[in-house]
């Protein structure tokens, strides 16, 4: 999925839009048309673009911020889609934001706790259980993130179309870029789920062997 995203982004990053808006300008315009008041800034890295609801800031990577390509405008508009979600109080986005703190703890602590619990005698299996619970929160976050990302893309494409920012063929290109990005979230969600099931199987097998 990541390879698909990179190749699709690379393809449409070489095709400029007819309007000539940069990613930064497109993000600002999409957010404005969607009723969101935001600040756009540039950050380092490649495809590190994000929206921070705490300060209403859209951060765009170097390959997006000043680029006038279909890919850049599509990615920038997607982040603006998140700002519109935030401005309109989109419930799944609120749930996702509420999960962020516990997910951060879970992503850091779950695997070390599981490893420690497996090393210790079986009477310390509760440590494994806590680790698996924390990892389960990470998996939940992944699955909550997927519809939020898809909704942000739908909002972005709607504004790009209705606002006349992209024309028909350009809109199709932006849609392909955003769909490729969605596939990476889908792949990450199922990878995390498979890992959770594997951890549950290991924990269950350990208990069974010590009965």
PLM segments and residue spans:
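Alpha-helical transmembrane segments of multi-pass membrane proteins
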Residues: 117, 134-145
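Hydrophobic alpha-helical transmembrane segments
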Residues: 123-133
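Polar-ligand-bearing catalytic/cofactor-coordination segments
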Residues: 2-106, 140-211
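Hydrophobic alpha-helical segments of integral membrane proteins
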Residues: 114, 121, 135, 192, ...
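Post-HExxH zinc-binding segment in Zn-dependent metallohydrolases
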Residues: 99-124
